Amino acid sequence: MAPVKTPNQNLLQQTAPNKVKVILLKLVKRQIFIPIAALLILVIFNLIADPSFFTISLSQSSSGDPVLSGYLITILDNASELVILAIGMTLVTAASGGQDISVGAAIAISGSVVLRVLCGTDSRPEMLHAPIIVAFLACCIVAMLFGAFNGALVAFFKIQPMVATLILFTAGRSIAAWINNNELPIISDAKFGYFGNFIPGIPIPTPVFIAIACMIIIALVMKFTNLGLYTQSVGINAYSSRLNGINPAFIKFITYVILGLCVAVAGFIKVSRFSTINYSVVAKDIEMDAILAVALGGNALSGGRFNITASVLGAYVIQFLTTTLYKFNVLSSALPAYKAVVVILLVVLSAPVVREKLARLTKKLMLAKTAKEAV
């Protein structure tokens, strides 16, 4: 004899699906839906194509220490610089309604400054010419000055962001080479390599921790200051913001300075990874990936409302996609084409109009299902 269901059991069975439907509808409308959906698609694809993609194992670093290895670790590690840049690029985009296309060249400059401070005029120094902290501070100051230069052109001279940053985009790598007299110094100090690789005894790459630290810092700044509110206000309507006592020019300027600081951190990691940099190719096209991360996060490239968490997820989506393509032996020369097709689809799906239509379609399907169940 079949067990008789009580009214409470029937109520619970009806309530649970309704809660799931409500959550799903809310998620579809949320800005963070697209990067989460993209990550899930990539995860499912790799699970079907090759489940070993998610294997994490212990291996030995070059110094003989046990470290974690696997594609997931590679994604977290290699995405670190992009995540840091995506944070700054989100603020710049929200405030100015434009993007900074010079971050790749600025990374080359900041890395060149690190090499100059630590190596001096010696291309193969046996010992560092200055403490590492001094090199990092010098790198930050120079990168923030270049950020201030871009910010001044945009905020005070009213030049379009892409045109203003095109100056440094064009000249930046030549400046980086000039700083070290067209030489490529190599840093042999083991401790300096900790920042871009592994710290002995810690099996997770150091850049992962640096990226997390940057996320925590920007989250605290957003929570305990009005920077986020002012940035959003200026991006939505600069004139109204001025009437409310906000200085739009200063807010735009400060976001470029913050992006400069993010560039400095990314440049420092780049140099630490390889003990040197090639000025002409280091961080090449990373500005495009940073802009795509912002777009994939559902942020309007015309400025206004923004979500840094969504941009960070967008950065991880891009790196996940890149690693997946390499995993399946896609030629590096063909990688941009594959990447562009997938990114175009994701960007179209992240458009507010498309998201609204998806939400309506989801709602209709759920209502139809509910009506069918009722019958």
Residue ranges of predicted features:
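Single transmembrane alpha-helix segments in multi-pass membrane proteins
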Residues: 46-47, 68-121, 154-159, 294, ...
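Transmembrane helix-bundle core of multi-pass membrane transporters
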Residues: 157, 161-224, 251-254, 273-283, ...
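Helix-loop-helix "hairpin" substructures at the membrane interface of multi-pass membrane proteins
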Residues: 131, 137, 145-146, 203-278
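Transmembrane alpha-helical segments in multi-pass inner-membrane proteins
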Residues: 263, 278-340
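Hydrophobic core segments of alpha-helical transmembrane domains in multi-pass membrane transport
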Residues: 34-48, 89, 139-143, 169-174, ...
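Cytosolic-side transmembrane-helix boundaries in multi-pass membrane proteins
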Residues: 1-48, 55, 236-239, 243-250, ...
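Inter-helical junctions in multi-pass inner-membrane proteins, predominant
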Residues: 55-57, 63-74, 179, 228, ...
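Alpha-helical transmembrane segments within multi-pass membrane transporters and channels
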Residues: 123-169, 314
